């Protein structure tokens, strides 16, 4: 089967987070020679398929210790869950439709197209040297993600099955297939700052202490401020205010406090501690409370790594373009792999219609992406 045929089948399952809808049974049926590991918690299902090709023999000096030499373990990872389709589609979002060179359906780009491409490439994998190939899929990436990839990786660590390298087939490209590889992601810190004042009647300002006035004086130092200068792969870390709230709704009462909710997307140069230190300097001598809660950590895979080199080589060969290495965008499951010291990158189709009405992927993209992924498998298994 090719990438198009598999992707069509995947789209036909209405796997809105965290529903799995039997899609894993279909995927397992494609790989009868692979070992299967599954885990389920709180309605979230995860699937891990793996196979060791040409298992290496024990080194003579290690025979007594019964230690086997481990082959390179490469993993394709992704999610089969999708966001709700909404209304006003030109066709049924869960009935894959081909029109004018595009495949339409919810998840076509995010990310059943990428999954279909790597499943098809994996079916064609036939290395001549010792090589371990695995596939990790979850039904909860678009949701909280607590019991998805993160949980499965805990199980894999327990069983000594963690991969060495991973490609997460998220839709990373902007205009043409091959123009972008995500080699890392920024971290995310959620914050809440409450500036305290003294509530009172607006007619007696000397008896009040309006925290909004206080906020106005420090706002230029916190709203949209760059926390560092970034680097070659990371944009400058930035603090962005997402919500402000003050007052009782009455026009003759000054508020007793003002609440500022914010988020900081940050590089490796900024941490929770450095952000706290900066805000404490800005807020010196003011009455306030501050809460900071990291929701994800920044990470990056070295641009000279074997995985990135092989991927770039096959993108150039297949797509005739040199990809930009970057860390733009929101968080993804790639961060969970990085936490275990695993080389991980993200590469997939164009992302111009993710989560949108009439989501679609071009048939040519699926064909080329499968070739890139197969080339990566061949390249890694030879090295």
Swiss-Prot record:
Pathway: Amino-acid biosynthesis; L-lysine biosynthesis via DAP pathway; LL-2,6-diaminopimelate from (S)-tetrahydrodipicolinate (succinylase route): step 3/3. GO terms for molecular function: acetylornithine deacetylase activity; metal ion binding; succinyl-diaminopimelate desuccinylase activity. Binds 2 Zn(2+) or Co(2+) ions per subunit. Belongs to the peptidase M20A family. DapE subfamily. PANTHER family: ACETYLORNITHINE DEACETYLASE, N-ACETYL-L-CITRULLINE DEACETYLASE. Its EC number is 3.5.1.18. Zn(2+) 2 binds at residues 110, 142, 355. GO terms for biological process: diaminopimelate biosynthetic process; L-arginine biosynthetic process; lysine biosynthetic process via diaminopimelate. Pfam families: M20_dimer, Peptidase_M20. HAMAP family: DapE. This is Succinyl-diaminopimelate desuccinylase. The active site is at residues 81, 141. It catalyses: N-succinyl-(2S,6S)-2,6-diaminopimelate + H2O = (2S,6S)-2,6-diaminopimelate + succinate. Zn(2+) 1 binds at residues 79, 110, 170. It comes from the Bacteria. Catalyzes the hydrolysis of N-succinyl-L,L-diaminopimelic acid (SDAP), forming succinate and LL-2,6-diaminopimelate (DAP), an intermediate involved in the bacterial biosynthesis of lysine and meso-diaminopimelic acid, an essential component of bacterial cell walls. It comes from Helicobacter acinonychis (strain Sheeba). The keyword Kinase does not apply. Keywords: Amino-acid biosynthesis, Cobalt, Diaminopimelate biosynthesis, Hydrolase, Lysine biosynthesis, Metal-binding, Zinc.
């Amino acid at each position: 089967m090719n990438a198009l045929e598999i992707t069509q089948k995947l789209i036909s399952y209405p796997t809105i987070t965290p529903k799995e809808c039997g899609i894993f049974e279909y995927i397992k049926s494609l790989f009868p020679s692979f070992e299967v590991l599954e885990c389920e918690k709180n309605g979230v299902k995860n699937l891990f398929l793996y196979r060791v090709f040409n298992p290496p023999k024990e080194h003579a000096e290690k025979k007594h210790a019964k230690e086997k030499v481990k082959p390179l373990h490469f993993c394709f990872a992704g999610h089969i869950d999708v966001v709700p389709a909404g209304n006003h589609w030109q066709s049924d979002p869960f009935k894959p439709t081909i029109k004018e060179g595009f495949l339409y359906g919810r998840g076509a780009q995010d990310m059943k197209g990428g999954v279909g491409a790597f499943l098809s490439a994996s079916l064609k994998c036939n290395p001549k040297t010792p090589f371990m190939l695995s596939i990790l899929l979850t039904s909860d990436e678009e949701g909280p993600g607590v019991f998805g990839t993160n949980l499965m990786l805990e199980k894999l660590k327990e069983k000594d099955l963690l991969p060495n390298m991973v490609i997460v087939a998220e839709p990373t490209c902007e205009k043409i297939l091959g123009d972008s590889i995500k080699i890392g992601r920024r971290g995310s810190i959620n914050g809440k700052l409450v500036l305290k004042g003294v509530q009172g009647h607006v007619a007696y300002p000397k008896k009040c202490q309006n925290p909004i006035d206080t906020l106005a004086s420090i706002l230029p130092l916190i709203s949209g401020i760059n926390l560092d200068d970034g680097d070659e792969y990371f944009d400058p870390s930035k603090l962005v205010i997402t919500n402000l709230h003050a007052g009782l709704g009455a026009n003759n009462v000054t508020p007793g406090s003002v609440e500022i909710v914010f988020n900081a997307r940050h590089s490796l140069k900024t941490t929770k501690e450095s952000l706290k230190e900066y805000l404490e300097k800005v807020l010196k001598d003011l009455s306030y409370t501050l809460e900071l809660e990291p929701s994800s950590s920044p990470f990056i895979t070295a641009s000279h790594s074997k995985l990135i080199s092989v991927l770039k080589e096959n993108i150039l060969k297949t797509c005739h373009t040199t990809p930009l290495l970057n860390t733009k965008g929101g968080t993804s499951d790639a961060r969970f792999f990085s936490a275990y010291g695993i080389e991980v990158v993200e590469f997939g189709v164009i992302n111009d219609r993710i989560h949108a009405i009439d989501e679609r992927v071009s048939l040519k993209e699926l064909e080329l992406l499968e070739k890139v992924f197969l080339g990566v498998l061949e390249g890694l298994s030879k090295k």
